[in-house]
Amino acid sequence: NNWVFDAPQTFSGFENLAALFGYPVQIFLDFSGYSDMSIGVAAILGFYLPDNFYFPYRSLSVTEFWHRWHISLSFWFRDYVYIPLGGNRKGKVRMYFNNFLTMLVAGLWHGSSWMFVIWGALHGFGLVVHKFFSRQLGISFPRTLAGNSLSWLITYLYICFAWSFFRAKDLGVLGKMCDKVANDFSIDYLVPFFHARPAWTLCIIGVMLSYLFTERQYHRLQARFILLPWVTKLLLFIICLQMVVEVSQESVQPFIYYQF
């Protein structure tokens, strides 16, 4: 993923597209992973820390996404930026403006780069559009399987689109990636890619299957795992460790959010 973003012109359109859709997964697993480790270490020491992520990529709107993603930071911006600006207490137009401005500030909080500003603006725009249609016009997707699926797909693609600005160094790099996807994309790359990277293929399949789990199914699976014999847990741990070794790079990769 990092290699593609560093030199997109040297990779195929398929690999560029895989990087664009892979980064949202990478940053979630990276950030959520070390948040979970912090929660676990704190629990060992007798302290309780609340969850910082709650199935963010199952969100059906940008508004819901920010109730599930980096919850501690979301609450901080709500309490110290959105509410002091007036929140939703000064009319609907002001509420939309406050939502948009809060997300702009969230973008700048990550760094003084136009790419972060654009990322924040996209999320602000997504919040405003969702609130306007759902609250002002009373328009929303029906709560059916088809409606939820379409709502999820639109939200997920929009979130991935916003993440591309967060990750790319500048608009030039992002433009090159989009150009490769548009002009050098072929499914003929799929078979060689999967044959050359079997461990990555298993990871990709695992991630895709994980999207099918509901919150209830996850908690049920978690409860069953806790009751497993220690030998079974050890075997599963060894399998996971082997997969990590297979896909890991030679150099140590720092956590993405450490820079923030």
Regions found by a protein language model. Give the residues of each.
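Membrane-embedded transmembrane alpha-helical bundles that form the catalytic cores
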Residues: 1-210, 214-259
